UniProtKB/Swiss-Prot annotation:
The gene is ackA. ATP binds at residues 17, 210-214, 285-287, 333-337. Its EC number is 2.7.2.1. Homodimer. It comes from Yersinia pseudotuberculosis serotype O:3 (strain YPIII). Its cofactor is Mg(2+); Mn(2+). GO terms for biological process: acetate metabolic process; acetyl-CoA biosynthetic process. Pathway: Metabolic intermediate biosynthesis; acetyl-CoA biosynthesis; acetyl-CoA from acetate: step 1/2. GO terms for molecular function: acetate kinase activity; ATP binding; magnesium ion binding. This is Acetate kinase. It is found in: Cytoplasm. The record marks 182, 243 as: Transition state stabilizer. Its main location: cytoplasm.
């Protein structure tokens, strides 16, 4: 099978992750991260041929300068690789209801991404910059740019899952509903779980937990998403690094009316100062929480709230499985590495038949997949995610 090299771009508000991946076998030829955009220390790091390199982008540099560097410096050193690029895949955080699957980028698609900016005000504008710069930098691939939406996998949710108990006109007229996030990751690990269990995806019932600085849980029934913990925005649901997740909406009125906080201050509090950071008052890093669980009250407090919330979501989603749950799957930076999070969470779910195997749980870290429960237990798995591969495969498939 001939190679299909795809440039995968993930443009954040202040960073750009990139990789060149062979969609036929998953081989990664180049990968890197440009970060600290709009700051004096803007820089780019990349791996090629097993070696790591780094360079300054110049004070105030952003997406345009980063893509110029990728094209004119990194790829210029690899002309054969550059010549073999067949497509460009773009990760898009929010596609609203318009996009139920990956699509080739057109003017209509660009407009659809713009229309979803209110639901992803930090991410979608950055994605649009990435698309515009890619079209400029690779004119030969102008019709080979593909948008892959984090929300697409969740578009199979039934109405009872995605509607809020608000006036229905807010959904009809303004699109206010649950959309979810991390869909590409939830889809990938569902596929991988089906392979491990030797089942067709359309017969698979799993609960997938993508746990990173942002986190979400998804109920997958017969291979399709039927509910997910993130909502209109990625603020709803689990305790996250700096995000509160679920809370009583009236807290917002109390913060405004009784404590004099502005809407912007409340937004900052809930999105950037809460979660693990808020509970520890030290850090958003789960490694601190895990390392200090036995000795520091702040770490224990944060870990206990985090795992309590996660276990509640897993437990509630078992009600959507039609009487059969094949596995719970952990993925993402925390899901793949924080053995303590997995153990404390599954210990709360003994009623459902989960019993952790300590040795297996400790072995399934740092990029290793595996079963983490005892043979007599209901199954729990660790599966490292690979969103970039899904994006590359979708881009290759749609541009073939």
């Amino acid at each position: 099978m001939s190679s299909k090299l795809v440039l995968v771009l993930n443009c954040g508000s202040s960073s750009l992750k990139f990789a060149i991946i062979d969609a036929t076998n998953g081989e990664e030829h180049i990968s890197g991260l440009a970060e600290c955009f709009h700051l004096p220390e803007a820089r780019i790091k990349w791996k090629v041929d097993g070696g790591k390199q780094e360079a300054a982008l110049g004070a105030g540099a952003a997406h345009s300068e980063a893509l110029n560097f990728i094209v004119n410096t990194i790829l210029a050193q690899k002309p054969a690789l550059s010549a073999q690029l067949t497509a460009i895949g773009h990760r898009i955080v929010h596609g609203g209801e318009k996009f139920t699957s990956s699509v080739i980028v057109t003017d209509d698609v660009i407009q659809g991404i713009k229309d979803s900016i209110p639901f992803a005000p930090l991410h979608n504008p950055a994605h649009l910059i990435g698309i515009a710069e890619a079209l400029k930098s690779f004119p030969n691939l102008a019709d080979k740019n593909v948008a892959v939406f984090d929300t697409a996998f969740h578009q199979t949710m039934p109405e009872e899952s995605y509607l809020y108990a608000l006036p229905y006109s807010l959904y009809k007229d303004h699109g206010i509903r649950r959309y979810g996030a991390h869909g590409t990751s939830h889809f990938y690990v569902s596929q991988e779980a089906a392979k491990i269990l030797n089942k067709p995806l359309e017969e698979l019932n799993v609960i997938t937990c993508h746990l990173g600085n942002g986190g979400s849980v998804t109920a997958v029934r017969n291979g399709k998403c039927v509910d997910t913990s993130m909502g209109l925005t990625p603020l709803e649901g689990l305790v996250m690094g700096t995000r509160s997740g679920d809370l009583d909406p009236a807290i917002i009125f109390h913060l405004h009316d009784a404590m004099g906080m502005s809407v912007d201050q409340i937004n900052t509090l809930l999105t950037k100062e809460s979660g693990l950071l808020g509970l520890t008052e030290v850090t958003s890093d789960c490694r601190y929480v895990e390392d200090n669980y036995a000795t520091k009250a702040d770490a224990k407090r944060a870990m206990d709230v985090f795992c309590h919330r996660l276990a509640k979501y897993i437990g509630s989603y078992t009600a959507l499985m039609d009487g059969r749950l094949d596995a719970v799957v952990f993925t993402g930076g925390i899901g793949e590495n924080a053995a303590m999070v997995r153990e404390l969470t599954l210990d709360k779910l003994g009623l459902l038949g989960f019993e952790i195997d300590h040795e297996r749980n400790m072995a399934a870290r740092f990029g290793k997949s595996g079963t983490i429960t005892k043979d007599s237990s209901r199954l729990a798995l660790v599966i490292p995610t690979n969103e970039e591969l899904v994006i590359a495969q979708d881009a290759a498939r749609l541009t073939a």
